[in-house]
């Protein structure tokens, strides 16, 4: 058995998958005594192949996660590389894997979120940890191909636009498609908070067995709580559908960034607008979104 969030390599990957592996310390579990920790011999990962059709797909799922696993097995926690340093060290190994035709997963593009907010205009400045790759993109909802527009430097955006970016290796092999939205909008107006407002969030627990957040409200209510953060109250067990509501204090006008991480579905609604859609049945996935607030 392995911690599934880190080491079930058949789980879908995102921008945090390798980072979480590198940050893992098998000796950091407070449930183990110093005497018990002496018996930790190493680390392992699992890959269940019932739904994996080809060896090429297996390669895609385990590389470079398998290399990150090896890194934490033989390197002391104090000297483990950062994600950026890890990919820098891998550059010559990626070239070797190109020659060997290994179907590795290209590192994620950097420089944008799932939803990006701007007021007048903004610039997309992409980077890829893997040198020698091409980045191509579309704005019409189609999947980028080798014939799509080439990203060749900073890209100015002046209107709300949906982008699909895709990286291509030197041999033409494509990466996953990265979808992002750039939203042009003025600062959202502040609202007047109730006079008797108390700190925290109101959390309503529903006895919910479904997969979509939109269906939670129709399920029976089992309890109401006040929580200090977005988290599951200790009393909540079994079938869980949580609806949390509250107010956000905005100290100054600006572009605010929100991260939404969940194992299965979650959504973030702000001022009645669905801002972050991380819904549906899935393993641990994080999305990051922005909104202009005053």
Regions found by a protein language model. Name each.
Residues 49-51, 246-252, 262-266:
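Beta-strand elements of well-folded, non-transmembrane domains
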Residues 81, 87-204, 209-246, 255, ...:
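Short, compositionally stereotyped local motifs that mark structural "simplifiers"
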């Amino acid at each position: 058995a392995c911690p599934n969030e880190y080491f079930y390599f058949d789980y879908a990957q995102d921008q945090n998958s390798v980072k979480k592996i590198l940050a893992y310390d098998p000796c950091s579990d407070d449930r183990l005594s110093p005497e018990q920790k002496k018996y930790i011999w190493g680390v392992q990962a699992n890959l269940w192949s019932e739904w994996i059709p080809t060896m090429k797909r297996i390669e895609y799922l385990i590389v470079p996660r398998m290399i990150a696993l090896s890194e934490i097995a033989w390197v002391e926690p104090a000297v483990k590389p950062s994600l950026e340093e890890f990919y820098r060290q891998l550059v010559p190994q990626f070239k070797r894997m190109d020659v060997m035709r290994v179907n590795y997963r290209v590192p994620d593009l950097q420089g944008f979120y799932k939803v990006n907010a701007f007021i007048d205009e903004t610039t997309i400045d992409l980077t890829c940890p893997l040198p020698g790759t091409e980045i191509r993109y579309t704005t019409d909802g189609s999947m980028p191909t080798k014939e799509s527009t080439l990203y060749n430097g900073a890209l100015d955006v002046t209107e709300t636009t949906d982008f699909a970016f895709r990286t291509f290796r030197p041999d033409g092999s494509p990466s996953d498609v990265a979808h992002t939205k750039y939203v042009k909008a003025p600062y959202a107006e502040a609202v007047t908070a109730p006079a008797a407002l108390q700190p925290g969030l109101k959390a309503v627990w529903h006895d919910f067995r479904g997969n979509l957040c939109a269906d939670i409200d129709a399920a029976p209510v089992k309890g109401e709580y006040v929580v200090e953060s977005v988290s599951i109250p200790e009393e909540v067990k079994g079938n869980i559908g949580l609806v949390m509501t509250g107010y956000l204090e905005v100290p100054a006008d600006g572009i605010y960034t929100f991260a939404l991480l969940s194992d299965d579905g979650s959504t973030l609604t702000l001022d009645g607008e669905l801002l972050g859609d991380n819904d549906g049945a899935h393993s641990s996935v994080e999305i990051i979104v922005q909104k202009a607030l005053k």
